[in-house]
From Swiss-Prot:
One of its GO terms (biological process) is DNA replication. Single-stranded DNA binding protein required for the elongation during viral DNA replication by strand displacement. Displaced viral DNA strands are transiently coated with the ssDNA-binding protein and therefore protected againt nucleases. The latter is then probably removed by the replisome that performs lagging strand synthesis or during the events that lead up to the recombination process. Has helix-destabilizing activity since it removes secondary structure from the ssDNA in replicative intermediates. This is Single-stranded DNA-binding protein. It comes from the Viruses. Monomer. Pfam families: Phi29_Phage_SSB (PF17427). Belongs to the phi29likevirus single-strand-binding protein family. Transmembrane segments: none annotated. One of its GO terms (molecular function) is DNA binding. It comes from Bacillus phage B103. Keywords: DNA replication, DNA-binding, Early protein, Viral DNA replication. The gene is 5.
Length: 122
């Protein structure tokens, strides 16, 4: 399992390490509880790897944690969320944004499966 953490904030500071620790240990609310179109006022996003046991099958998954302006954490284990969050992290870092808005997008695949994604909105 890799220990790499990708984030919009400095994960080498005490504040950054505390955010990661709290996200890993408390997890916060699930992104699945957000309705389609929910706008999240974010102050940070981080991604880290965790191992999950799915019916005896260990696999490594990317956890995406969104840190809200009011101090909450919203987390997701989703490939589509992780892909979108990776791009959002890059943009937020490139333009040095302290706060930003993320929109939750809930969609259905061609097979009828529901999936989530994230959009960066102004």
């Amino acid at each position: 399992m890799t220990n790499e953490i990708k984030a919009t904030f400095d994960v080498t500071t005490l504040e950054g390490r505390m955010k990661i620790l709290n996200a890993k240990n408390a997890g916060g609310a699930s992104l699945k509880t957000c309705v389609d179109g929910t706008i999240i006022e974010a102050v940070g996003i981080a991604q880290y790897q965790q191992e999950s046991d799915t019916y005896g099958d260990m696999k490594e998954e990317t956890v995406t944690a969104i840190f809200t302006a009011d101090g909450d954490v919203i987390s997701a284990i989703s490939k589509t969320v992780a892909e979108a969050a990776t791009e959002i992290i890059d943009l937020v870092k490139e333009f040095n944004l302290d706060t930003f808005k993320v929109k939750v997008s809930k969609q259905k695949s061609s097979k009828g499966n529901e999936f989530f994604s994230l959009l960066l909105v102004g």
